[in-house]
Regions:
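Bacterial Sec-dependent N-terminal signal peptides
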Residues: 1-37, 248-251
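Extended soluble regions of mature proteins
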Residues: 32-251
Length: 251
């Protein structure tokens, strides 16, 4: 009896995944393509520290109990062509009780434009660029997130040196997601970063019959902007500098 080899098995899995995505997209094509998603961002501070600085002993650190796990919320508004992602200010506070810094991500698929307005450690960065392509690898793993059946995909983040795992909804054929993540054949409802040290997970999904209102972030015309690549290089340098500090990373 002939047994399928690894190449044939892989081809079969690919065909099955393609069929599932095609069926889900066909089923959902007539559904709403506008709405709002609230994500909860959970940060395991100790796990993040271990990921960023694996050679440093963790027993040299001490945190208040409430600092070990940080939770915040952010909102993604989307239409068929635009998105805007922002923290929910009244629920997103830093660990000293102050308001969270700016972190707005806007995209327009029709114009192939993306804009970041991010203030980190008091420094404002404005990104105005074309939407970068993300090379995802879809796997055959599946699970439920916020009431939706999701498939898994991985992305090799060469800037931070990590493998990112995304879970996208088969019945929401819109290529968006939280923060800067996009480019899958379904809405990203969960993102796992830094070896599970930080997780973005959809908590509520509200669809709309009419397009939600989305405004592109405004900034002074003379403000210097940068490309996505330049911003990524800036973040990488910032992370490396933070690692060298006596106190290490701050989350």
């Amino acid at each position: 009896m002939h047994r399928p080899n690894q190449k044939q098995k892989k081809m079969k899995r690919t065909l099955i995944l393609t069929a599932i995505i095609t069926l889900a997209t066909s089923f959902a094509s007539a559904q709403q393509t506008s709405g709002t998603i609230v994500y909860e961002i959970t940060t395991d501070v100790e796990k993040m520290m271990k990921w960023f600085m694996p050679d440093r002993k963790m027993d040299t650190y001490s945190w208040k109990e409430e600092w070990k796990f940080r939770k915040s919320k952010a909102e993604l508004k989307f239409t068929a062509s635009e998105t805007i992602y922002e923290p929910i200010v009244e629920e997103t506070m830093d660990r000293w009780g102050g308001a969270a810094e700016e972190h707005t991500i806007y995209s327009n698929r029709d114009k192939n434009k993306i804009c970041y307005v991010i203030r980190m450690m008091g420094k404002l960065s404005i990104v105005d660029d074309s939407i970068p392509k993300m090379k995802w690898k879809v796997t055959n793993a599946m699970k439920e997130v916020a009431g939706h059946i999701c498939m898994s995909a991985t992305y090799n983040d060469t800037i931070m040196g990590q493998e990112i795992t995304a879970w996208f909804a088969l019945d929401m054929p819109i290529p968006y997601g939280p923060d800067v993540y996009h480019g899958l054949p379904g809405m990203i409802l969960q993102i796992d970063l830094y070896g599970g040290g930080q997780i973005y997970a959809a908590k509520t999904i509200t669809m709309s019959d009419t397009p939600v209102k989305i405004d592109k972030p405004k900034y002074k015309k003379k403000t210097k902007t940068m490309t996505v690549a330049e911003y990524q290089a800036q973040v990488y340098k910032f992370m490396q500098d933070m690692k060298k500090r006596p106190g290490g990373m701050m989350f």
